[in-house]
Regions:
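Sec-dependent bacterial lipoprotein signal peptides
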Residues: 1-26
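Beta-strand-dominated extracellular/periplasmic modules and repeats
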Residues: 27-147
């Protein structure tokens, strides 16, 4: 039978407190505000992509941050809570286009506006560096080819 003496109890409490401090110091401190805009090749704001999702993937931390493109072509990223930002590091970026309905019944999608390669992390070619502090990022994309 193991008896817990006051010394062992204090040692256990101290270890628990140190673990908790170490755990909490590593959580949440690496999220930094990120806002940005999506522009078409040539510089025009990609306002037509309103409602589409911007996704920042940080492979080494196996985490992602997401934002929704607004009517003015801008976005703000969220990781844990709304608009908190993204972890620092070199991110791979993709954009998931929100394709609108082409008819009132919602049975036909409008043609894609965005080149489909931007929906694939391996093909998009988009990267962004998030640094400690506030970040402003511009993502340049290309239109889908007319078929």
């Amino acid at each position: 039978m193991i008896r817990f003496t006051p010394f062992r109890q204090r040692k256990g409490y101290a270890a628990a407190v140190l673990f908790l401090i170490a755990f909490l110091s590593g959580c949440g401190n690496d999220i930094h505000p990120v806002e940005g805009q999506v522009v078409w090749k040539g510089g025009a704001l990609a306002k037509e992509l309103e409602g589409s999702h911007v996704v920042f993937e940080l492979p080494e931390k196996k985490t992602s941050a997401r934002g929704i493109i607004q009517a003015d072509g801008t976005f703000r990223l969220s990781t844990h809570k709304p608009n908190d930002g993204a972890p620092a590091g070199e991110h791979k970026v993709l954009i998931l286009e929100d394709r609108k309905n082409a008819n009132a019944e919602g049975t036909l999608l409008a043609p894609a506006l965005l080149d489909p390669r931007f929906a694939d992390l391996k093909k998009s070619g988009l990267t962004a560096t998030v640094k400690p502090g506030a970040n402003t990022i511009t993502l340049t994309v290309e239109r889908a080819q007319a078929r």
